[in-house]
Amino acid sequence: DNQGDKVPDLKVRAVFEALRYVYVSNHQILGGSWGMHVIVPLVHQSLDTPIPGIDDGKTFGLGDITINPLIIGWHLSPEWHITAGLDIGLPTGKYDSADPTDSIGANYFSFEPVVAFTYLAKSGFEASAKLMYNIKTKNDDTNYQSGDEFHVDYLIGQHFGPWSAGLGGYYLRQTTDDEVNGKPVGSDGNRGKVFAVGPAIKYDYKNMSFMGSW
């Protein structure tokens, strides 16, 4: 719940396969390389809930696609790299306000400024962090406005030829209230916060990378 306590007998399981296409051009903007990306998620989701009126269920399908038409990367040295851009979330995933078990998408647009830092030593050691601030539009089906969120993805790992392995995770904190019909939800605006860490592995093959994390 929003106090960080477990909800008894509530279980949500989700597995994502995110297909990310990245294009980096030879054009320069503000001294950095211009590129773009598209992220297409496929989602396997199951829900077991004790909440009255909501049935257990499973679903699979296309999630909400993310596009970023403007990514700028600066390579300050062989070790230090910085990128900045604006991710735009599109409500492409299936959604049914009357059936949460069959809903994969969020049913709103999101706009997320992104700044990422990477340190990659000659020894293969890597430390990376990606800072984001997520701003959402209102879900018109429910008249629910989710609050803004600040979050950080991080990774510490080691490269071994085409392989790399390490620890990765994220920290998220909601900075503004959730609202329904223009009024805050509950006494605390239903503000959430999450911290997660787990193993991560990546394999690079030609112009492709395969990543897994838990």
Describe the function of each predicted region.
Residues 25-35, 74-82, 97, 121-125, ...:
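Short loop/turn motifs that connect adjacent beta-strands in outer-membrane beta-barrel proteins
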